[in-house]
A protein has these predicted regions:
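Active-site-lining helix/loop region of Rossmann-like oxidoreductase modules
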Residues: 1-138
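C-terminal active-site/capping subdomain that shapes the small-molecule cofactor and substrate pocket
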Residues: 99-214
Length: 214
């Protein structure tokens, strides 16, 4: 399950969601400044504004602020979105895997109102029963960017959010634990700034390679 930031759509999408937040805030500004205002009345007014058709939704099609959109990209006609298809196709292409060697990946892709840094919740079935500490060690030692976050509330709240990951090449990986489905089933949650990894960083690396060959 991916939780993808507004910036995945582009600059205009980021502006749109910020504008929606602004308009929703303006709708209940008086109530927010009144400690005696009932929260249910504030919620009613926000929901009415979201449903009014007055918010700018030219980019996303529906309000994203204070909500989410459980569909990204085009409809492939088989119940799957193109973004969900890409997760399997691109992963195996990057790994160079074909046929029976392919890693089977599937899930839902959801747009959320974070500004940048995509997140994903993973359910993995391993081929053998490994201790959690060993899994954490493998992840931590694989590359310089993966940063294991201890599976505690405080560490998760501090280091495993889009706010914590944005602007950095580090990829926090946390919530690693055994699942009740069986000892080979492992959960994990990751966050990464796709504006760096998906755009700026590949270009920077290509330029370094090109400059090195001049």
């Amino acid at each position: 399950m991916t939780y993808q930031a507004a910036s995945g759509g582009g600059a205009r999408h980021m502006r749109e969601v910020l504008g929606q937040f602004r308009d929703l805030g303006n709708e209940v500004s008086a109530e927010l400044n009144d400690p005696a205002a009932a929260i249910l009345e504030i919620d009613r007014k926000v929901l009415a504004k979201q449903r009014s058709g007055e918010l700018d939704t030219a980019q996303f099609g529906v309000p994203l602020s204070g909500s989410l959109i459980p569909w990204i990209d085009s409809d492939l006609g088989n119940g799957q979105s193109r973004e969900e298809w890409k997760s399997d196709a691109e992963t195996n292409k990057i790994l160079g895997l074909e046929g029976d060697d392919r890693v089977i990946m599937d899930g839902l892709c959801v747009r959320i109102a974070a500004m940048r840094s995509h997140s994903q919740a993973l359910t993995m079935k391993l081929t053998e029963d490994l201790p959690v500490a060993e899994i954490e060690r493998i992840i931590a030692e694989d590359n310089q960017w993966a940063q294991v976050v201890p599976n505690t509330k405080d560490a998760t709240m501090e280091g495993l959010t889009p706010v914590a990951a944005s602007g950095s090449l580090n990829i926090p990986v946390g919530r690693i634990r055994k699942l009740a489905m069986g000892p080979q089933y492992i959960s994990a949650f990751t966050v990464g700034d796709q504006l760096l990894w998906g755009a700026a960083e590949p270009v920077r690396r290509m330029l370094k390679i090109a400059v090195g060959k001049l």
